[in-house]
């Protein structure tokens, strides 16, 4: 059952990153001087003739991330309102109702008024003198500019809207289409994000704290495996070109997979629904204590947990972003990395670092050590590793074999520490005295929801930092090094400052259901790594395990 929910989350991650990878490029504005027949692919060419700039591009991600936050916060309330089974099915269904964005983003043979591509008329073809002999009447083309006149390929006159960077980016109709495209795409994000929170009530129903630790740690496999499945094939240029050219069919296939997953879950979950949180009717509300979402949010421990989860989420997501990669390029003084696939390779190394963390660091979560010192160690180690990545990028550069190799190695190591930190944070609600099992779905809804809010704020600030030199000078090719340095300093500072919050965390407890058995008072020292070989009752370190 836990595996089904996690598989649904894996499908979400795959679908989400596939849509990002098959984005394609802008349609570009055709003129009399255009010397090559354009090749259109991906959904971006349906709406834009030029890039709108870094900040507007990031603003789309901010909007979607904030919507994911809202969905995550509400997911716990939905369990109380509809019961676990129906709450999960609603969110899987929400992922499926995104399908209108396929229609909105497809040119539909040039008949979609919300896109820029139109069947070329003979009159327009004759004006594109350098490529007219290579064009056919009815061929899909983007907007054309002849002199001061701008028109669609079918001859319809249009006016282009300027973006924040001064570029003419599209028509009012295509911008409207893009807005609808993002709205329906957001349903994938809202529905998919909540599934990782819905894996937690299943874990909470387990009697063994050790099993809870193992499955909480394994939850991250969903994201990491999904990203690797997407990124690895795109290292082959032919795969990327094919997927981008056929993006509608690729995404349609993904939506059908999610729908199939919904049907499988509905069939299987019906057999075990009685074991999980049920809808709170007036009758059973009077027989049991109903968890209050507001009362949980008012607790000081909740906000401490949210702060730590927020910084942890920033740590996990930031190295996956274009902002981080651009920052590394800026401090290395290079316009581009040594190989075109540098960013996908670093993405894969970061998420594959989870393997290192899973076997080397995450076993700590199964011990009876107090978690505070461990959290101090992991956050501080991550700050040091991030600084090492920055130092290697600045001194050796991303445009050299040696520099990229060292950045890649330490990205993998930092990923191990980062993902193990995530699993350490997720185990905390199960060990805190004041949280009960029937509150788990609400708590993790808050954890994921507010974590995305904190990350969105961080992403907005760092994106503004990075683009500030260009905006201030009005020069789109201005050096972004000052902004990159500011973004890196903020990133490292958060990893260090959060140690102050950790000091005030409550103690962890060994629990049997909601019963607190014993407080975890054993203090961990950096020289104590016996938990790596402890295996229940088979050796002298078994007392370290729960």
Swiss-Prot record:
Superkingdom of origin organism: Bacteria
Keywords: Cell membrane, Membrane, Transmembrane, Transmembrane helix, Transport
Entry's transmembrane regions: 2-22, 62-82, 88-108, 179-199, 220-240, 248-268, 305-325, 344-364, 377-397, 401-421, 442-462, 485-505
Subcellular location: Cell membrane
Any one Gene Ontology cellular component term annotated for this protein: plasma membrane
InterPro entries: MFS_Mycoplasma (IPR011699), MFS_trans_sf (IPR036259)
Membrane topology listed for this record: Multi-pass membrane protein
Assigned protein family: Belongs to the major facilitator superfamily.
Full protein name: Major facilitator superfamily transporter MPN_077
Organism: Mycoplasma pneumoniae (strain ATCC 29342 / M129 / Subtype 1) (Mycoplasmoides pneumoniae)
Taxonomic lineage: Bacteria, Bacillati, Mycoplasmatota, Mycoplasmoidales, Mycoplasmoidaceae
């Amino acid at each position: 059952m836990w595996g089904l929910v996690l598989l649904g989350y894996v499908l979400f991650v795959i679908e989400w990153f596939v849509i990002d990878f098959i984005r394609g490029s802008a349609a570009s504005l055709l003129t009399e001087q255009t010397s090559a027949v354009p090749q259109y692919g991906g959904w971006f060419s349906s709406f834009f003739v030029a890039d709108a700039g870094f900040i507007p591009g990031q603003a789309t991600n901010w909007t979607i991330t904030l919507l994911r936050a809202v969905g995550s916060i509400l997911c716990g309330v939905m369990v109380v309102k509809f019961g676990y089974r129906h709450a999960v099915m609603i969110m899987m269904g929400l992922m499926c109702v995104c399908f209108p964005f396929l229609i909105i983003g497809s040119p539909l043979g040039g008949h979609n008024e919300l896109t820029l591509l139109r069947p070329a008329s003979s009159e327009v073809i004759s004006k594109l003198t350098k490529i007219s002999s290579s064009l056919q009447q009815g061929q899909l083309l983007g907007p054309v500019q002849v002199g001061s006149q701008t028109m669609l390929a079918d001859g319809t006159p249009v006016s282009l809207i300027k973006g924040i960077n001064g570029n003419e980016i599209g028509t009012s109709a295509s911008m409207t289409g893009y807005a609808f495209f993002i709205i329906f795409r957001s349903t994938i994000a809202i529905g998919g994000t909540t599934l990782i929170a819905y894996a937690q009530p299943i874990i909470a129903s387990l009697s063994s704290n050790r099993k809870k630790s193992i499955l909480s740690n394994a939850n991250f496999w969903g994201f990491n495996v999904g990203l690797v499945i997407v990124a690895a094939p795109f290292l082959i240029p032919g795969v990327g070109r094919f997927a981008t050219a056929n993006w509608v069919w690729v995404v349609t296939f993904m939506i059908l997979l999610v729908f199939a997953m919904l049907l499988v879950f509905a069939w299987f979950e019906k057999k075990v629904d009685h074991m999980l949180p049920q809808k709170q009717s007036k009758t059973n509300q009077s027989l049991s204590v109903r968890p209050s979402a507001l009362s949980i949010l008012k607790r000081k421990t909740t906000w401490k947990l949210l702060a730590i989860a927020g910084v942890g989420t920033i740590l996990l997501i930031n190295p996956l972003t274009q902002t981080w990669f651009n920052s590394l390029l800026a401090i290395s003084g290079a316009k581009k990395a040594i190989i075109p696939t540098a960013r996908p390779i670093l993405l894969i190394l970061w998420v594959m670092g989870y393997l290192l963390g899973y076997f080397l660091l995450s076993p700590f979560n199964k011990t009876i050590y107090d978690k505070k010192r461990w959290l101090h160690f992991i956050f501080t180690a991550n700050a040091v590793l991030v600084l090492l990545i920055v130092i290697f990028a600045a001194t050796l550069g991303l445009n050299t074999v040696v520099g990229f190799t060292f950045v890649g190695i330490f990205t993998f190591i930092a990923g191990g520490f980062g993902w193990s930190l995530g699993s350490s944070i997720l185990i905390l609600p199960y060990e805190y005295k004041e949280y009960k099992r029937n509150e788990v779905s609400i708590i993790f809804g808050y954890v994921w929801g507010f974590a995305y809010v904190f990350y969105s704020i961080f992403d907005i600030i760092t994106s503004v930092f990075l683009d500030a030199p260009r905006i201030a000078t009005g020069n789109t090719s201005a050096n972004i090094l000052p902004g990159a340095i500011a973004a890196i300093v903020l990133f490292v500072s958060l990893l260090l400052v959060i140690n102050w919050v950790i000091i005030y965390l409550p103690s962890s407890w060994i629990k049997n259901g909601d019963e607190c058995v014993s407080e975890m008072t054993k203090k961990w020292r950096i020289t104590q790594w016996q938990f790596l070989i402890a295996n229940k009752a088979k050796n002298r370190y078994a007392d370290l395990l729960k």
